[in-house]
């Protein structure tokens, strides 16, 4: 399923953007229209370097607002977790207010986003919030799929193989054989010949057996 099919299913199969319908349409993008330098040089630049209508708060979140055509008023679109979500919200409002003359942050916003038929501020705010949330959900699914693949590969690599089992047993065997060298070192420190390792030695034997053992 391609991106157009996915979003057509999300917004309804009969949905058709008022901008993309009716002939060829090549939207004007923010990347092709560089922003003018900010006039306030004494203050920190809060505008996003590329996205239109997007500013960063001190908290790290992003806000979006758009000026209404031929008016001094602005429509507040909300506060968002990422700049991309705010940029999507901007595109909804820009298309609703300016149509094909809108400068968009994303080229696919012309056909991906559901644009309200009314230019009422509340309708635009609702559609902008919906577009931002849909974009967030899409990014979450992509991230989840990527992490799921990584986790699957990690689990496959972490399987306990028979070779690893044999290596673990071999280490235990070495530890057991190391007991003889330990006894050799102890005997050397006492200037005595090293005794043989008798794991089933009976401590109740007679003293003569001890003498015959050390005589060899």
Swiss-Prot record:
Main location, first listed in the record: nucleus
Tissue-wise expression: Expressed in leaves and roots.
GO cellular component: nucleus
Motif segment (Nuclear localization signal): 35-47
Record-annotated DNA-binding residue ranges: 50-107
Keywords: Activator, DNA-binding, Nucleus, Stress response, Transcription, Transcription regulation
One BP term from GO: cold acclimation
Region (Disordered): 15-42
Induction, per UniProt: By cold stress.
Pfam families in alphabetical order: AP2
Subcellular locations according to the entry: Nucleus
Single Gene Ontology MF annotation: transcription cis-regulatory region binding
Cell division as UniProt keyword: no
InterPro entries documented for this protein: AP2/ERF_dom, AP2/ERF_dom_sf, DNA-bd_dom_sf, DRE1A-I
Ranges annotated as spanning the membrane: none
Protein family per UniProt: Belongs to the AP2/ERF transcription factor family. ERF subfamily.
Record-linked PANTHER family: DEHYDRATION-RESPONSIVE ELEMENT-BINDING PROTEIN 1A-RELATED, DEHYDRATION-RESPONSIVE ELEMENT-BINDING PROTEIN 1D
Protein function: Transcriptional activator that binds specifically to the DNA sequence 5'-[AG]CCGAC-3'. Binding to the C-repeat/DRE element mediates cold-inducible transcription. CBF/DREB1 factors play a key role in freezing tolerance and cold acclimation.
Protein name (Swiss-Prot/TrEMBL): Dehydration-responsive element-binding protein 1C
Origin species: Arabidopsis thaliana (Mouse-ear cress)
Underlying gene: DREB1C
